[in-house]
Curated annotation (Swiss-Prot):
Organism: Bradyrhizobium diazoefficiens (strain JCM 10833 / BCRC 13528 / IAM 13628 / NBRC 14792 / USDA 110)
Lineage: Bacteria, Pseudomonadati, Pseudomonadota, Alphaproteobacteria, Hyphomicrobiales
InterPro entries per record: GCL_type2/YbdK_subfam, GCS2, Gln_synth/guanido_kin_cat_dom, YbdK
Matching HAMAP family: Glu_cys_ligase_2
UniProt-recorded name of the protein: Putative glutamate--cysteine ligase 2
One MF annotation (Gene Ontology) recorded for this entry: ATP binding
Amino acid sequence: MLRLDSSDDKQHLVIRSAGGRGKAAEYSFGIEEEYFLADRRSLDVAIQTPNELFESANWSTGGQAMREMLQSQLEVATNVHVDVNDAREELRFLRREVANVAAQYGFVIMACGTHPTAVWRMSQPSPKPRYEEMIEDLRSIGHRNMMCGMHVHVQLPDPEKRMAVMRAMLPHLPLFIALSASSPFWNSHKTGLKGYRLAAYSELPRTGLPELFESRHDYDEYVGALQRSGVIPDESHIWWAMRPSMKHPTLELRAPDTCTFVDDAVAIASLYRCLTRHLYRRPHLSKTVTVVERAIAVENKWRAQRYGTDCIFASKDGPITISELLSRLIDDIVEDADALNCAAEVEHCRTIVERGSSAEFQLRAYRENGNDIAAVSRWIAASTISGRALRSDAPRLRRHSARASFGNDNGIPEFAVSRAVSWRKA
């Protein structure tokens, strides 16, 4: 069991074992995934969803499933983990549990950045005061927020070094966007982008890449100004691609699309975790990120959205392929991957580049089925539950493939009752 506690110097929050016998391993992490709820027969996105579904899902997962801003969305959050294999197994468990509950109400879950055929104008806010207030403020832009992302929290106790890591991490954010791209369709149209989600998400205020804050004080001053001006109630309304958590001693990656494959989600989370460790131990690297590097990162964010795993990034030295960029990064963090026992997961990022992210599979399903967008939805629904790529290329799909993939395995893995802390809505 894990719990939040104070550090030995009483200056920071840390994760400790429930027995109090010392800190858990540094750089513990958690993963949040958002899913679409869709009609089990038509795979059209759900418009209205009953509270009982979410109550059942919350109970079934031990409190790890909840509503999101729109009724068509459901979010799960893992517990805090120090072992990457535990995190993988919990994600699989959470998908199985919420899928089984959703099926009882006539729905399936779909893990992707955008639903291929969803019509945002029909979206309805979830019946919670927080979300109703957000829709009242955001209006049409809030209704257009029909998209799903993956968030990764990594524990970094020192708030000053946490801000240094956020700044140093900024040039790397486009890589996470490219690796996770799973949103090539919007409103039944092929967008031409591999990751359309962030293009739509950028309509919201306080999104995109973080600013170049020099210190935690500067960040707090910015947040305080918005709060005193009545712009935001708290810093959870800052929706950058990465942000410090409001409630926990973590730095939260928010850039990725929800991954269709569990192994891809765990690989991207592991890459981020290793890089945070690397940068946390070298806070001076934040000073190398200037306005020029940020401007290049903004361009590369667009390129990652447009091209996904086919991306060629811009750099001061000229173009660099995603394969070369990833290889350099893996070389830099090899010590960190060994220390965190996730070298295999980091290496899986190379597999994502070689065979493509979910966006490539979706586009293949579309082409191989005569440009039938319904085939894309069937592929996503089936692959969400299997959680893995069944072949190196997207299979030809039949109408029954999603339905045939739903199992009845309700086994609860040991970790589901052996963790006590999770990072949600922070």
